[in-house]
Amino acid sequence: MSYVDAFYESGKDTVTVVERVNGERIIKDVKPEHNFYYGDPNGKHKSIFGEPVTEVRCNSQKDFKKNLGICKHNGLYESDIRPVQKVLERDYLNIDPPKLQTAFFDIEVDFDPTRGYSTPEDAFSPITSIGIYLQWMDAMICLAVPPKTLTWEQAHEVASPLSEVKLFRTEKEMLDVFLSVIEDADVLSGWNSESYDIPYVINRIIRTMGKSETRRMCLLKKLPKERKFTLYGKETQSFDLVGRVHLDYLELYRKYNYEERHSYRLDYIGEMEVGEKKVVYEGSLDRLYNHDFLKFLEYNIQDVMLLDKMDKKLQFIDLANIIAHENTVLLPVTMGAVATTEQAIINEAHRRGMVVPDKAKGERERDTAAGAFVATPKKGYHEWVGSMDLNSLYPSVFRALNMAPETIVGQLRLDYTEEEIANAQKLEKRSFADAWHGKFGTNEFEFVK
């Protein structure tokens, strides 16, 4: 017994938990705990700072808010922990994670000669094919609408070598079957699916079938929740699913792979990890769709199979699943760092019989700067070059210090430097770190430059 997803419904004052038990999906409503603590010299509980606190237990969210108003001037503890988090910690701490049923998917989109390729936000072009791999069934399915260059009979004949292909006359029919195929999936995953496949599919469902049908992407007839985020300086649309989990495998790879890659294209990563690339073709994907439909289908299938093969090797979804259940957080929460760490601290504090204070309100966020000064760099050779770009340290070293594998011209023996450091340690009784004081590089570097 363990959870896949959970969400709080304020109208019913319940937490709905989706479980996967022995291959079966179980959905149940759980009564959440409405409790908090406040500072009290006579309190029987202790905070992580050793301060005495008193617990307040409430029967409903309404009573909870009422009591918060009464006690807020005494200093609040754990009043900002969400009901879902309280339920997961109470009911699922130290319980093994479930065996998730994962569906990898990838879409291909038509090309409009006059308007070009459409974006997920303005999904004016229809989806031409959807590849889906149901990992728990070891089943590959490719749904496709044939190009207008082929008759219905010709399309069937062309696709006949691929038993996993099912053809449709309209995009609407194809999307309807897609929603049926993923019905028993716990996790949907694609490559760059957060900013492309998920929003594109949902927006095409809205255009062809109506907004109400997007509920089938979630469970319990819930609508996907639209979310905006900034990607490469541009506001991007995505959707969060409810009851079913979406994990972008590109983001999983970025997070859990231990080294930076020069490119994060699926073609490059697939070759790096499993020795396979995308299907190679000449010209545009639109030309491939219209003039070599069989290879187009193979292209879509290979993209999805690459994801499955990489996951079988890397097991990043399993890793996210383990981290989520070790810390009693939801799977999507593991894509960040702060919320998972916070819950881990809360769980450990409770294990020690302590409670944690509410998070400080973001007063700093209200402080804004009028602007910033950017100095014009002086051309030429500079010593003592530093960089704070820790997120992209390797390329920063390229730019700032001209240090890269292709710039190596030889190696220097550090005889002079090692002798100087050794003498400073032995004769002057200085520490190793102190012996380097005032030196930016080795003596040999100074000689060569």
Where are these regions (language model features)?
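Non-catalytic nucleic-acid-binding interfaces of large nucleic-acid enzymes and RNP effectors
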Residues: 1-82, 183, 207-240, 275, ...
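Conserved catalytic core of nucleic-acid polymerases
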Residues: 71, 77-80, 390-393, 403-404, ...
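Short helix/loop capping segments that flank catalytic or ligand/cofactor-binding pockets
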Residues: 112-115, 141-142, 198-199, 255-257, ...
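Short secondary-structure boundary/capping segments
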Residues: 119-121, 199-212, 324-325, 400-407
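Short glycine-rich phosphate-binding loop at a beta-alpha junction
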Residues: 186-194
